[in-house]
């Protein structure tokens, strides 16, 4: 090979590496809203200095504070009754996400503006089914799905959403809003609509006597309660190499990559099957108890929530990958007792691949909630006890010991079980046609990431609480090799 061929090969390697980095950033959440800075546009620090959030001190660390609400107690009567003022030429619009035309407007806005790389190579592809699943959880309020339209044309140019969620932070459980999908049209970023949208959704949430919120961002705002890192598991090496997601290592071949990332043809855990509606009470009890081990977690106060998040997005028809399916949930049923001993689930969020001659969609799966009873004493495990966890209890029904509170023997059992569960769910994802399986360092994911061949991404996801002082919570991103679980038990879409 002459020097020109060598240079061309080097240039090609650089091009593919840069392309892969762009896609990794998208999957990691580092590139968002299509802005050139590659950050999630949740408002400038100047705006957040006016909000009831812990402030970053001069040393870069949050000031020592007592956990609890930041603002003085208020009532809905103290809240402004009229919407905030928008720039001239724009108007507020409450979005009916169940209306096909309006949900399509949100879908188009998000797909074209929410997340893409600077070269418009990849975009998140939110389906209508995904948005319905994400935004219509039990108790949702249509008033919390807020849009901004151009007055003359009625074109939807901005959106923000909130859904009700019960959050437990250590020993305290309280109602909150989960804020998501803040999106402003790329051509209107100079209008500073993001802070206006945040203020408006805050106003509407406060009118329902809810004063706290949880949200995430790939950038540092005042002030994260914890940070998780993204990891990715290759399921389709030929395609990921072809689109530039994964470089082909020097001296390697596609065949070697296929062998390296191959999975068995069938799940191996006895009793591993798809979750059914009749499993909901047992799954709910198991999931609540498992999440009690974390410092921050969704409370899942009733089984309606469990059914919605794990079953309502299962799609239509049966067998294989269903039409309109967005969530996959599997359980392990003890063959002898017929008790549910384990749960594992994931959801689908594909990305459109722009300007590629062969591929137009990256099928990405994201680890969702899971639980197993191996962390509990045999006498009280869900598989060996008839004692039910009260689904409607106001406080955690099991003392929150925090992940990492188990002894070494129990931790080893947990590690072994989670690796087995993850190995089986990777098989399901592969059979369903997914190209990559993504996971954060939350929950107990660190116990299986390395063994199941997940590779680290370069993105981090920061968790935030609005109007709640909170000591830092370990997001697990420093301890993947130590297989130490994190203290974050909330999975946000």
From Swiss-Prot:
Q: Which UniProt keywords apply?
A: Acyltransferase, Cytoplasm, Transferase
Q: Which organism is the protein's source?
A: Cryptococcus neoformans var. neoformans serotype D (strain JEC21 / ATCC MYA-565) (Filobasidiella neoformans)
The name this protein carries in UniProt is: Glycylpeptide N-tetradecanoyltransferase
What is this enzyme's EC?
A: 2.3.1.97
Tell me what reaction this enzyme catalyses.
Answer: N-terminal glycyl-[protein] + tetradecanoyl-CoA = N-tetradecanoylglycyl-[protein] + CoA + H(+)
Has keyword Acyltransferase? yes
Coiled-coil boundaries? none
Q: Which PROSITE patterns match?
A: NMT_1, NMT_2
Chain residues that bind tetradecanoyl-CoA:
45-48, 182-184, 190-194
């Amino acid at each position: 090979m002459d020097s020109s061929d060598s240079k061309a090969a080097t240039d090609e390697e650089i091009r593919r590496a840069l392309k892969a980095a762009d896609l990794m950033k998208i999957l990691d959440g580092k590139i968002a809203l299509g802005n050139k800075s590659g950050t999630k546009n949740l408002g400038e620090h100047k705006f957040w200095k006016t909000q009831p959030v812990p402030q970053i001190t001069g040393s870069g660390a949050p000031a020592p504070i007592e956990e609890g609400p930041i603002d003085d107690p208020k009532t809905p009567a103290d809240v402004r009754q009229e919407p905030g003022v928008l720039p001239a030429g724009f108007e507020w619009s409450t979005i009916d996400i169940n209306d096909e035309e309006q949900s399509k407007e949100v879908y188009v806005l998000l797909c074209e503006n929410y997340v893409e790389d600077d070269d418009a190579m990849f975009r998140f592809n939110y389906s209508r089914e995904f948005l319905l699943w994400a935004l219509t959880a039990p108790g949702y309020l249509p008033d919390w799905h807020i849009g901004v339209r151009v007055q003359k044309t009625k074109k939807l140019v901005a959106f923000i959403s909130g859904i009700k969620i019960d959050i437990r932070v250590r020993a305290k459980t309280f109602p909150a809003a989960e804020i998501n999908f803040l999106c402003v049209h790329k051509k209107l970023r100079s209008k500073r609509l993001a802070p206006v949208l945040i203020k408006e959704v805050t106003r509407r949430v406060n009118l329902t006597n809810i004063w706290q919120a949880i949200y995430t961002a790939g950038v540092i705002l005042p002030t994260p309660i914890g940070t998780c890192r993204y990891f990715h598991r290759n399921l389709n090496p030929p395609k990921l190499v072809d689109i530039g997601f994964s470089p082909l290592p020097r001296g390697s071949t596609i065949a070697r990559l296929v062998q390296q990332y191959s999975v068995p043809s069938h799940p191996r855990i006895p009793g591993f099957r798809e979750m059914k509606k009749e499993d909901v009470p047992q799954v709910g009890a198991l999931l609540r108890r498992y999440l009690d081990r974390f410092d921050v977690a969704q409370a899942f106060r009733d089984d309606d929530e469990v059914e919605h998040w794990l079953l309502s997005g299962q799609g239509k028809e049966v067998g294989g990958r269903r039409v309109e399916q967005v969530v996959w949930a599997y359980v392990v049923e003890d063959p002898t007792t017929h008790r549910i001993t384990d749960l594992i689930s994931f959801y689908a969020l594909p990305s459109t691949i722009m300007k590629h001659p062969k591929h137009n969609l990256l099928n990405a799966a994201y680890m969702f909630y899971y639980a197993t009873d191996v962390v509990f004493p045999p006498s009280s495990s869900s598989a060996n006890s008839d004692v039910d966890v009260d689904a409607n209890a106001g406080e955690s029904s099991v003392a929150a010991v925090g992940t990492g509170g188990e002894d070494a023997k129990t931790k080893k059992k947990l590690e072994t079980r989670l690796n087995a569960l993850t190995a089986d769910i990777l098989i399901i994802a592969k059979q369903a046609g997914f190209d990559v399986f993504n996971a954060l360092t939350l929950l107990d994911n660190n116990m299986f990431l390395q063994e199941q061949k997940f590779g680290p991404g370069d993105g981090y996801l920061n968790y935030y609480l609005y109007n709640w002082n909170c000591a830092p919570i370990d997001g697990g991103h420093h301890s993947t090799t130590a297989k130490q679980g994190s203290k974050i038990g909330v999975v946000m879409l």
